[in-house]
């Protein structure tokens, strides 16, 4: 299993993404699972990299399935890829994120439903199955960390899944890190599955 980081490009800027401890790059392990992550990426974003646990990687390489109870995704917002942020501009961006969190402002349910419908349709096509999922009960947990180059916000969500009529629920803790690297804005999404059939 390749334990090196991943080099990505945002516009013409090369960025080296270090590999999180205990995780490996998904792209070289399973093109199908990586494609699934691309299907779940909003149309406004671009998936740069995905990282899964070493145990999941071993399972996939041996022909098994990944549990995906913990994983990382790195994305960009496509309309901002050509913009190079100054530290001052990113400071204003952090301020707006902080303000939204302090007032518990998050995606409204209609927008969440729109995003999950898009992902459900893509996954159904990919696996030729009736797949749907929804996100409800989002609880913002506020800003979990902040530096001059990054701000992280966390939340708890209930994921409801249905595959060919078989339903299950999961409680997911998620953290989104908005990271400034070489003037480019990266979105790092970290997910951990805590409870199944919550």
Task: Name these PLM-found stretches.
Residues 1-3:
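Hydrophobic h-region of N-terminal signal peptides that target proteins for export
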Residues 5-44:
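Start-of-domain marker
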Residues 12-14, 20, 69-73, 173-174, ...:
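Extracellular structured ligand-interaction cores
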Residues 19-21, 29-30, 78, 154-157, ...:
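A mature extracytoplasmic/lumenal domain signature
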Residues 36-166, 171-172:
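Conserved polar/disulfide-associated segments of primarily extracytoplasmic proteins
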Residues 170-181:
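Short, surface-exposed beta-strand/loop micro-motifs that present aromatic residues
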Residues 183-198:
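Surface-exposed amphipathic alpha-helical segments
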């Amino acid at each position: 299993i390749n334990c090196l980081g991943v080099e990505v490009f945002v516009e013409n800027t090369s960025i080296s993404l270090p590999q999180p401890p205990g995780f490996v790059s998904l792209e070289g392990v399973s093109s199908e699972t990586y494609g699934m992550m691309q299907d779940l990426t909003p149309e406004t974003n671009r998936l740069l990299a995905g990282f899964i646990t070493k145990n999941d990687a071993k399972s996939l390489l041996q022909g098994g399935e990944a549990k995906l109870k913990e994983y990382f995704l790195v994305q960009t917002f496509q309309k901002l890829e050509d913009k190079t942020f100054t530290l001052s501009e990113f400071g204003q961006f952090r301020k707006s994120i902080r303000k939204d969190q302090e007032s518990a402002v998050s995606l409204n349910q209609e927008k969440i439903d729109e995003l999950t419908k898009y992902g459900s349709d893509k996954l159904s096509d990919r696996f030729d199955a009736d797949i749907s999922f929804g996100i409800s009960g989002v609880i913002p947990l506020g800003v979990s960390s902040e530096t001059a180059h990054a701000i992280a916000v966390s939340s708890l969500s209930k994921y409801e899944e249905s595959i060919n009529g078989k339903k299950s629920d999961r409680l997911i803790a998620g953290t989104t890190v908005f990271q400034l690297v070489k003037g480019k804005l990266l979105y790092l999404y970290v997910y951990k599955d805590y409870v199944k059939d919550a």
